[in-house]
Structures are given as structure tokens and as C-alpha cells.
Amino acid sequence: LILSGNKSMTFKELAFSCWENRISLSSTGFYKTPKISWDQEKFKGSPYFYFTWGAAVSEAIIDIDTGESRILRADIIQDCGSSLNPLIDRGQIEGGFIQGIGWLTCEELYFNPEGKLLTLGPSTYKIPGSRDVPPEFNIKLLENTPNEEKTIFRSKAVGEPPLLLSISHFLALKNAVSICLLYTSPSPRDGW
């Protein structure tokens, strides 16, 4: 119910009246991030309002006969500033990390000779599934690290940065493959 002076109407009536009278109920705005600059020629400046830091360690296993791999464990610590909602931040960190695993291990774009994208949906474009989440997944939010910049309650955004932490999984796989090669490399004794 909307009240204005002695008049009242429901929200539905108000929306319909606006539609009938061609009154837009939407708005557009722009945000200019403060304190950012970049000089491409000097390769100097501050391209971001603030930075967030994180670190990750992953443990992986690979089947040398089939090439199938699994992530066994991931340990992540992430700087969130003064977290507004630790559960949401943890979800963002988990999601970004798993998205990164997909980017580095199973997602591929295929195009036909005319340039048309062929991997258009779940049947042709493989994304991470529930088995790609490590059975042991430890996330810690770095404590006592309020943002130095004047952000909302000195928080930091953590939606995209954890994507790059998944490089730890790629490097764990690389290490596992190199160990396999170390023990399976042909030698003169093997008749090579």
C-alpha cells in the first residue's frame, strides 16, 4: 500500500498507472572509482582502488594410466578486509576457486571453420561438477586486516580474486605429472 496525503493505492495500481502513462520505473547511473590512474607509456599508476591478497595450496592425484585427476585438498587464506558477512565471503571464495579449476582443467571453447561457437551448452561445454570440489576444502579469512581505503565498513570484494588461486591446483597437477615422468622415464637399461 502506498500513501500520499489522503490518497492511497497498491503498488500494482501504481505500476500499472506508470505503464499507462509511459513513466519509466528504472534508472541508470554511473560510478567512477576514486583514486585510480594509469600511465601506459611509463607503466605506472594505481589501476585499482585497493588490492586484496590470497594464497592457496592444493593436493591432487592423477591416474597415470587414464589421465584422470582429482583434487584431494585445498587450503585457502583470503584477505577480505573487515568482512561484512563471512559466510557470503566464504561462498564467493569457494565459487571463484571452483570456477578457476574449470577454467584450468576442463573448460574449452571449440569453433567451426566459419568461426561459430560449437560448445554452446552443458552437453558440449564441460564445467566443474560436485566431484570437482575437493573433499577437504579449508578456507580461512585473514583476520584484522581492515581495508585502508574508505570502503563500506572497510570491507574488500572477494568475488573474482579467488579464481586465480586455483592455479595452485594446476601446479599440483603439473607436479604430479612430473613425478610420474620421473619414475616412468625410459632409460638405457630399458632398451631405449
Where are each of the predicted segments found?
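C-terminal catalytic domains of large/alpha subunits in multi-subunit enzymes
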Residues: L1-S185, R189
